[in-house]
Amino acid sequence: TPENVMPFSALAYFFAKDVYQKTKVPVGIINSSVGGSPVEAWISEEGLKPFPYYLNEKRIYESDDLVESMKKEERSHAWNVALCQGDKGMHEATPWYAADYDDSNWTETDLFTSGWATNGLNTVNGSHWFRKDFQVSAQQAGEKATLRLGCIVDADSVYVNGTFVGTVSYQYPPRIYTIPAGLLKAGKNTITIRLFSYGGRPQFVKEKPYKILFGKGQPEKGESEINLEGSWKYHLGAPMPAAPGQTAFHYKPTGLYNAMIAPLLNYTVSGVIWYQGESNVSRRNEYKDLLTAMISDWRQRWNKSDMPFYIIELADFLSPTDKGGRTAWAEFRKAQAEVADTNKNVTLIKNSDLGEWNDIHPLDKKTLGQRVAAAILIEMNTKNRK
């Protein structure tokens, strides 16, 4: 429904929609996905038998005592508590996000310069605060408004005129915040961003939209917008050491298979759309074997030896100057192609041309979904002719 579709897979939605529009046959889709997951987490213990390294890792984490001890040792909660306690912006008499806060002694900066993110020698983790005043007309103040803040590394909380309007806890999602009706007023308004840096790369991602959109967000149709690039006020809130890492136990071998595939085996499944790989690029030399093992494993579990798999090619990513990184991604795409070439009923869906150099999760899932739909419809028509 329109109310619950947003957290769902955009690729799966557009694929199913396109198939339905062309066939008038409803398509049932199951979304079983976890961002950032490695392929070995999606393979059963039986399927991992050819990979003793991963089987051994799996058995290590079978110990409840080990898992509990690791959870107790990990300090991420303590790090966040220390950050909140030490953040001056939250504890002054007038908090830094307040509409009437006096930021006249703050530093002028540009969001995309690196000067604010460093102490001269190293990047600074912790909290960084930004404020910007902007003018709104009486007409704009009465319209629906959406705040676009590109992508931010790592996390953020955002306020408009002292009112909290949204937060994202990690770097990848586009920042799209609704400004509640009545919050903007004719004349001067203020946006405050509290940016959190965990791992030494605080930044606002370049070449993304930083603006306020009014109405339906269609400036090409005459609706207004306010550009938020340019000068901002800046102040460091709380410098911190790098945040301690956390162990993603569900990423361990067999973890996601047991939790998210095994419970689905009683469903009748016609095929699989497989969009994964970024987390395996550093181990690309083994990916062909691992993905082939996963395909065979799932086919055995569903007792369908020819169950179709549609592998989504990894999208283009990284700056043109990052030769090493781009080479690694190209080699990974080659491994994906080899899986499709050497396994029956496995199709590679082109996606590299839909990538964005500055976004590991490119936004155009509609075109990609239509490509998957086209591949499946071709296969259906071929079978029908037989």
Feature-to-residue mapping (PLM):
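Loop/turn elements at helix/coil->beta-strand transitions in domains of secreted/extracellular proteins
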Residues: T23-G28, K188, Y267-G271, K304-Y310, ...
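Alpha-helical scaffolding within the catalytic cores
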Residues: P174-R175, H250-P263, D289-D297, T327-A337
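An acidic-aromatic loop/edge-strand motif
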Residues: T1, I30-T118, K188-N258, L264-Y267
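Surface beta-strand/loop "capping" patches
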Residues: L121-N125, W129, Q135, A141-T146, ...
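Aromatic-lined ligand-binding clefts that engage carbohydrates, nucleic acids, or primary amines
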Residues: W106, F134-G162, I191-I193
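Beta-strand-rich ligand-recognition modules
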Residues: C151, V158-K211
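Extracellular beta-rich ligand/substrate-recognition surface
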Residues: A117-W129, V165-Y172, F249-H250
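Substrate-gating cap/lid alpha-helix
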Residues: I30, L314-S352
